[in-house]
């Protein structure tokens, strides 16, 4: 697929067709026009303007300082750089938790900047907010498992959903978000078997990061996948620059690995 790049921007319907056909969806985080153009040329299906920009672009220890204005700025830059990839924008900490009205207002800002969908963290507690947003024309991706905006509540960056009770809570969260109208779920740092169950039971697109190979697709943090800067990374990260002739080649290899199911491998996966 990397050799065939369409000129029309992908839509939710296009991603649904990939999902229904059993084709894995390849998503990268990206924050600027140059990398967006490179990823688009490699055939990426979706770009996430993640609040991870707080870590990899702004140099913060957490994602918490990122603002709506930050995400909107980078979303607009990404949109200008690519013609094909489906664009998802993160809702940063403090931009949606107060009320559904606050969430809609800030999501509308991100949609105006070029997002086709927004992503927010939280489970059943956020279902009323998701329902409010979807009913007013905002497509929503839920984010459950390890939710970095709740790092202080979680006590650090730890694998979630371990143990029967924790796994059931995560399943309940997934079903609540689906019922509220979320058409995509990002599953982060949970056991692969649990991610497979959630994917099967919800019937919506699931995008994994540290959640095993049975999700509908994978999201890769650009800087991690390209080893920028070199150093220790999370277990689920693969350095696609190893053996690559260029960053474009690394991007093509990463997308192909998601599509053919070779990434993530067992070495990138958490067990229950």
Swiss-Prot record:
Gene3D superfamilies named in the record: Phosphoenolpyruvate-binding domains
Residues noted as binding Mg(2+) in the record, renumbered to the chain: 51, 90, 121
Record's subcellular location: Cytoplasm
Enzyme class name: transferase
Recorded family membership: Belongs to the PanB family.
Its job: Catalyzes the reversible reaction in which hydroxymethyl group from 5,10-methylenetetrahydrofolate is transferred onto alpha-ketoisovalerate to form ketopantoate.
Assembly description: Homodecamer; pentamer of dimers.
NCBIfam families cross-referenced by the UniProt entry: panB (TIGR00222), PRK00311.1 (NF001452)
Protein name stated in the entry: 3-methyl-2-oxobutanoate hydroxymethyltransferase
Species this chain originates from: Dechloromonas aromatica (strain RCB)
Gene field: panB
């Amino acid at each position: 697929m990397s050799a065939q790049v369409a000129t029309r921007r992908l839509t939710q319907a296009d991603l649904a067709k990939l999902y229904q056909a059993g084709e894995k969806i390849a998503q990268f985080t990206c924050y600027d026009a140059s990398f967006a153009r490179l990823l688009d040329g490699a055939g990426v299906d979706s770009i996430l303007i993640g609040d991870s920009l707080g870590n990899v672009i702004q140099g913060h220890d957490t994602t918490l300082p990122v603002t709506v204005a930050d995400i909107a700025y980078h979303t607009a830059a990404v949109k200008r750089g690519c013609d094909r990839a489906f664009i998802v924008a993160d809702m940063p900490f403090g931009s949606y938790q107060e009320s559904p009205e606050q969430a809609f207002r800030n999501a509308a800002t991100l949609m105006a900047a070029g997002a086709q969908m927004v992503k927010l963290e939280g489970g059943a507690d956020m279902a009323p907010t998701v329902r409010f947003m979807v009913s007013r024309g905002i497509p929503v991706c839920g984010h459950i498992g390890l939710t970095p905006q709740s790092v202080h509540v979680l006590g650090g960056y730890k694998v979630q959903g371990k143990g029967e009770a924790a796994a059931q809570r995560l399943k309940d969260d997934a079903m609540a978000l689906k019922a509220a109208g979320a058409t995509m779920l990002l599953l982060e740092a949970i056991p692969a078997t649990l991610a497979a169950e959630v994917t099967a039971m919800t019937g919506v697109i699931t995008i994994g990061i540290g959640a095993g190979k049975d999700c509908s697709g994978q999201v890769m943090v650009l800087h991690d996948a390209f080893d920028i800067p070199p150093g220790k990374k999370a277990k689920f990260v693969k350095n696609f620059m190893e053996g690559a002739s260029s960053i474009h080649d690394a991007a093509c290899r990463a997308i192909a690995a998601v599509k053919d199911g070779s990434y993530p491998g067992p070495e990138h996966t958490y067990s229950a």
